């Protein structure tokens, strides 16, 4: 067995039939020809040792003969000379054969010793050099023929390695996975019982991965699935437990990297990581990521996990207490989606050692479900502005532009009376809180005269925590955000003070400040709208957090992203694909969605099949959520109210899935949203009017 710093388990020596390094294909192929036994012989019946007569003495003759002519750093010349006692495995007949051919005194003196150390040498086990000891001149003449023999042997070894890989059976692979699982389970039991240190345990785990299918360096000719292999799921769980829970300290960073890299090659060998995956082989270490539980996920325990979380949300909040924002997120975790397993992520704003101890207690709850805890929490996606957000867009032309073009850190419209969706928004008097204009809703009053006054009205929608105020019942709203414009103005004014009076730079900054002032004054004279209703409450264990804003009749309201928003990574978001044309009531797990927030702009993700459970406002709540993909960012402060959208498959245009209200504040990879169906249902219950994303047709 290949040893890592000389540490390994004794029981591994008893279980393994071969002692092969997994990182060297040629050595593995050469060693397998002389040392294979048990299962490996059954896998490769066409091995070069098929001749019984030759096979009987192959081991001994190879070891014996290889010491006679080989390259050595201890000999005076390029070739070494036989000792007559090549190995303790040599038979008495072979030793007498050696004595008959050797005329040196040293050979006779060393014949009686069985454990004489041998010099380092490069040998071929498939075609051993026969023992021929003669004068130095004869050895010199034999160098050419010996080299040719070694080259031919290397080619045969490589060919036999490919033959052995082709002959590996699926039964043998599953047996090897089962053995690896047993070894790793034993290690984990020893860790939890404090029998072995984590440092030694991870070294042994790495060694076990090295010895998995040692004769196969590349991919196996089969495809192993996590759904059908319980051993593979358990192996994944143990490795993730190492990486996420046991090796989180900086002291284990090197061990963590080695184990992760070894695990990567293990998955690649099983075809769970393909060349099409985003993991490069340029020396950059792979990393663990989170993925959504999609509609194609058929892993065992998924239904049971969903039932547990559903029951948890029904519990009485009065008997539960936790840190504000703490959450439980059911997800997939691994290197790639195809190689990931079911995972329960515990997010806690104040992570302590006792939480890791809790994970150890829960470790055996599910045999193939990974659990880990991170410093993270759920928070509202409104922004309490302390600095300017990084998202930039084109400038608004309310006055003549300056010769120096500035790009404010918020989206603006080419026409101030035609405001597209997803722009920044705040109340007129707000000094800190800012969010995103989700879109527009239109009441469907029909022929009911009681609601005829609302028939031609347009209403904007955003999160209630963005615009509701205790100081004012029906505040006026500004788009773009008054908070962002005021903050941007302060930054420019402060920067202008660094330049001398009359300089070109200071003049440019002051002109931009003047332009912002004029735009703010225009917005106050041409009010966008006023909040008429909103609520932030728990209804049926679900958060209802939205408000509707009656828009001034001088504004033209359309559910479109607008042509002024140009920073889209998706090139297909053009023309008809800029317009929201349908409501999506039936959400498919794994559906690809995106949002355009006032803070982070365009980000994409996938819908998770199971809801996230979190503790907020003294109550246990649940919510649908999006897992960021392919980048690990989905939402941040200032994105509250942004619509969750998807591209329609059967026609051009966008579908409305829901509205963002929260995100995980530390890692920002989850976006919590309210489905559009729930929003419209709640609005109908409150107003007694049907609502839609399209204006009511006359007649």
Curated annotation (Swiss-Prot):
Question: Where on the tree of life does the source sit, at the highest rank?
Answer: Eukaryota
Q: Which cysteines are joined by disulfide bonds?
A: none
Keyword list (alphabetical) reads:
Cell membrane, Membrane, Zymogen
InterPro entries linked: Peptidase_S1_PA, Peptidase_S64_Ssy5
Per the record, which residues fall in region Disordered? Answer: 1-113, 129-158
Q: Where is the composition biased (Basic and acidic residues)?
A: 39-51
Q: How does it sit in the membrane?
A: Peripheral membrane protein
Q: What induces it?
A: Down-regulated after extracellular amino-acid addition.
**Known role:** Protease component of the SPS-sensor system, which regulates the expression of several amino acid-metabolizing enzymes and amino acid- and peptide-permeases in response to extracellular amino acid levels by controlling the activity of two transcription factors, STP1 and STP2. Catalyzes the activation of these transcription factors, which are synthesized as latent cytoplasmic precursors, by proteolytic removal of an N-terminal inhibitory domain containing cytoplasmic retention motifs. SSY5 binds as an inactive protease complex to STP1.
Name of the molecule in the record: SPS-sensor serine protease component SSY5
According to the entry, what is the taxonomic lineage of the organism? Answer: Eukaryota, Fungi, Dikarya, Ascomycota, Saccharomycotina
């Amino acid at each position: 067995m290949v040893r890592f710093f000389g540490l390994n388990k004794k029981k591994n020596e008893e279980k393994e039939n071969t002692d092969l390094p997994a990182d060297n294909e040629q050595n593995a192929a050469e060693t397998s020809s002389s040392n294979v036994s048990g299962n490996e012989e059954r896998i490769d019946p066409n091995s070069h040792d098929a001749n019984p007569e030759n096979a009987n003495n192959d081991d001994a003759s190879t070891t014996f003969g290889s010491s006679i002519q080989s390259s050595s750093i201890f000999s005076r010349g390029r070739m070494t000379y036989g000792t007559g006692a090549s190995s303790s495995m040599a038979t008495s007949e072979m030793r007498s054969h050696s004595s008959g051919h050797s005329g040196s005194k040293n050979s006779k003196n060393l014949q009686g010793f069985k454990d004489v150390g041998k010099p380092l040498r490069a040998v071929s086990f498939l075609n051993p050099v026969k023992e021929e000891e003669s004068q130095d001149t004869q050895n010199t003449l034999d160098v050419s023929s010996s080299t040719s023999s070694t080259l031919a042997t290397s080619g045969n070894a490589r060919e036999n390695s490919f033959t052995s890989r082709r002959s590996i059976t699926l039964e043998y692979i599953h047996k090897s996975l089962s053995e690896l699982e047993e070894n790793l389970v034993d290690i984990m039991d020893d860790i939890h019982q404090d029998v072995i240190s984590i440092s030694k345990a991870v070294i042994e785990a790495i060694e076990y991965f090295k010895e998995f299918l040692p004769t196969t360096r590349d991919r196996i000719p089969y495809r192993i699935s996590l759904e059908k292999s319980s051993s593979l799921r358990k192996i994944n769980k143990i490795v993730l437990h190492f990486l996420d829970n046991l090796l989180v300290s900086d002291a284990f960073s090197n061990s963590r990297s080695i184990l992760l890299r070894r695990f990567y090659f293990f998955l690649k060998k099983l075809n769970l990581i393909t060349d099409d995956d985003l993991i490069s082989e340029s020396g950059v270490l792979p990393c663990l990521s989170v993925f959504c539980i999609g509609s194609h996920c058929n892993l065992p325990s998924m239904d049971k996990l969903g039932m547990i979380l559903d029951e948890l949300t029904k519990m009485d909040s009065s008997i539960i207490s936790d840190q504000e924002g703490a959450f439980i997120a059911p997800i997939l975790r691994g290197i790639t989606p195809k190689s990931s397993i079911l995972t329960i992520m515990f997010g806690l704003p104040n992570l302590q050692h006792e939480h890791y101890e809790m994970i150890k207690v829960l470790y055996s709850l599910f045999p193939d479900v990974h659990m880990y805890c991170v410093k993270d929490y759920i928070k509202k996606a409104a922004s309490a502005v302390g600095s300017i957000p990084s998202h930039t867009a084109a400038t608004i032309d309310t006055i003549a532009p300056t010769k120096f073009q500035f790009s404010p850190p918020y989206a603006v419209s080419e026409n101030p009376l035609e405001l597209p969706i997803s722009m920044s928004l705040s109340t007129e008097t707000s000094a800190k809180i800012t969010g995103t204009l989700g879109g527009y809703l239109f009441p469907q009053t029909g022929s009911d005269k009681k609601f005829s006054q609302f028939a031609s009205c347009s209403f904007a929608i955003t999160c209630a925590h963005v615009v509701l105020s205790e100081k004012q019942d029906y505040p006026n709203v500004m788009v773009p955000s008054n908070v962002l414009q005021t903050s941007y103005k302060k930054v420019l004014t402060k920067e202008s003070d660094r330049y001398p009076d009359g300089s070109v730079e200071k003049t440019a900054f002051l002109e931009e400040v003047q332009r912002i002032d004029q735009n703010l004054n225009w917005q106050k004279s041409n009010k966008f709208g006023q909040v008429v209703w909103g609520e932030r409450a728990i209804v049926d264990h679900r958060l209802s957090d939205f408000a509707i804003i009656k828009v001034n009749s001088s504004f033209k309201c359309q559910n479109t992203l607008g042509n002024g928003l140009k920073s889209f990574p998706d090139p297909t978001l053009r023309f008809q694909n800029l317009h929201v044309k349908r409501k999506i009531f039936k959400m498919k797990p794994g559906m690809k969605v995106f949002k355009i927030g006032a803070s982070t702009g365009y980000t994409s993700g996938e819908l998770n099949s199971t809801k996230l459970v979190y503790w907020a406002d003294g109550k246990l709540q649940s919510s649908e959520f999006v897992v960021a993909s392919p980048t690990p960012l989905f939402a941040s402060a200032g994105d509250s109210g942004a619509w969750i959208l998807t591209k329609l498959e059967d026609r051009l245009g966008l579908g409305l899935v829901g509205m963002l209200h929260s995100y995980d504040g530390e890692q920002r990879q989850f976006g919590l949203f309210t489905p559009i169906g729930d929003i419209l249902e709640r609005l109908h219950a409150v107003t007694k009017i049907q609502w839609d994303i399209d204006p009511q047709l006359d007649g």
